[in-house]
């Protein structure tokens, strides 16, 4: 995994990456990938042990380093919920404004990852980037 500081991405940059990283409909692209993230179309908990670190390349971040306290406000204009697979990927809203962006080196799938810090727990979460859902 790349440990250097990733570039800050806006919605347009994330959309370009997502469009370039969408697995094709070829038979090879439909095979299960060793990353095992293809099913994470909504936010999914993932332990450090399950995170496919060797396959993932950090390609950017949605976390603005100038914002010390990004908003916890969510954006659901169509009435979706946080955990819905069709919820918009609104880069300036929670939880996306706390995400790093990764690409799988095996299948080219683009995923978002952030850590939820609860009162008594730490929960790493991941979601596949669907280009059709990316918004500002």
Predicted regions mapped to residue ranges:
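Flexible low-complexity loop/turn motifs enriched in small/helix-breaking residues
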Residues: 1-8
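Short Cys/His-rich Zn2+-coordinating modules
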Residues: 8-20, 48-51, 58, 63-67, ...
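Short metal-coordination and nucleic-acid-contact micro-motifs, chiefly zinc-binding Cys/His arrays
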Residues: 26-31, 97-100
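Short cysteine-rich clusters marking metal-coordination/redox-active sites
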Residues: 30-38, 104-107
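Short Cys/His-rich "knuckle" micro-motifs
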Residues: 42-47, 114-117
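Short cysteine/histidine-rich metal-coordination sites, predominantly Zn2+-binding motifs
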Residues: 48-60, 118-128
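Short Fe-S-cluster ligation motifs
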Residues: 66-76, 131-136
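Short, compact, well-ordered microdomains
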Residues: 87-136
């Amino acid at each position: 995994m790349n440990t250097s500081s990733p570039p800050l991405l806006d919605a347009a940059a994330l959309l370009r990456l997502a469009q370039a990283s969408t697995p094709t409909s070829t038979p090879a692209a439909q095979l299960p990938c060793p990353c095992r993230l293809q099913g994470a179309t909504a936010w999914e908990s993932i332990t450090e042990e399950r995170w496919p670190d060797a396959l993932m390349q950090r390609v950017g971040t949605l976390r603005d380093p100038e914002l010390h306290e990004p908003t916890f406000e969510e954006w659901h204009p169509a009435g979706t919920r946080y955990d819905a697979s069709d919820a918009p990927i609104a880069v300036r809203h929670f939880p996306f404004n706390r995400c790093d962006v990764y690409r799988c080196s095996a299948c080219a799938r683009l995923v978002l990852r952030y850590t939820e810090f609860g009162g008594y727990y730490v929960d790493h979460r991941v979601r596949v980037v669907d280009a059709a859902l990316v918004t500002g």
